[in-house]
Amino acid sequence: MDPEAIILSIEALRPSQETGISPSSALYLVAKKKRYTIKELRMARKILHTYSIYRRSASRYLENIISESMIDWVSKTILELISSCIIGGIDFGDITVLVSKLRQSMGKNWPEELEKHLGVLRLIHLRPMVEVNYPKWFTRYLEKIMGKMDAEYYLDFQDRVNPPMYASLNTLKMDEEKILKLAEERNIVLREDNRIPGIYLVEASNTKALKDLMNQGLIAIHDFSSYYAVKILKPKPNEFVLDVCSAPGTKTWLTALEMKNRGVIVSIDSSWKRIKSQVKRMNFLNVRIVEVIQADATKPLPIRLEVDKVIVDPPCSSTGLIWREPFYRWIIKPRHIRMFSNLQSKILQNSSRHVKQGGYLIYSTCSITIEENEHVIEDFLRINPNFELVEPSLSIGSHGLRNLAEARRLYPHTDMCNGFFIALLMRRY
């Protein structure tokens, strides 16, 4: 084990704990300050990912042995980091050898206080029960909506399995056959997902070659769920589409692909900074049919339009993203879910006013909570009888809860994608 990956992980945890950003985001910031090898960066990301899952288990274990007042931050962080990884199954080899390498690499920055506590690392041998690695409220919540057995499997699955990488080909810049040929020449395996044509599972041993295609705008990485949502909506060339809460623009681009760059997409987001980033990305991907508007969608939108299709992908608790960003499990609280639910209802209501008669609106979140999904749709349908929930033409995933059978739920352990909710609504009159 290269000690540089552990040292890099420690350096990333300081801004993470000081500012509240995720360890993976902090790693990105820290790594820009010094040149690291791809191997070191990959290992550091793996260490921080595992730490985010098991740090609560490691912390409880260490609290039973060491008083927090007796140990400095660096020593505590090193112990928690290595303990978390041992619990999570990362093989560091001989701990004595690892510590010796760390001591040598850190030099004068090595905390002497740590020496008397190193023995605890050799005592860790049992992996805790899965509930310890999640807040109790979250495990109980999942048991309530999924049942105890499915909830336990779901939680264990997303901590054990590496999320797959999905991509679509940017046919707005190059023909599909040519992109596939370029990928093959670079030993990038693109295996088409048999559930929906046009989305690929990416297997690339040469990450530099993959990055090269991405830097050319020929391939874009995104989750299966985003592609599925756009496919359900079925945007067509020459249609008028409204994309609400659109940044960073993944669904905007996927919609433009379906429309073959013909028609109009009006993208709305509350953040001018995100809008500027989205405009830059759309230009890079050769999307030519997007008009952008800065507006707060929790208030009536500053437009007088009735459009063919509306995409509503509001801010959410991101409970469906925990398998990609395990740090989220420790920062999401029930109060956040209630807050998001209220915000989502306002955004959905304001967006729905711009659907023409016979038009469609798709509502989606990367959350698996009922409050942000089924409750929002139930409340909306109750006060908007001119809309109805319709069955999607592509039946993937599970049916919605609370008798909303036409809605769709996706889960990592059953659908190998982010946890996701989708509801397709049609305006009848």
Regions found by a protein language model. Give the residues of each.
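S-adenosylmethionine
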Residues: M1-Y429
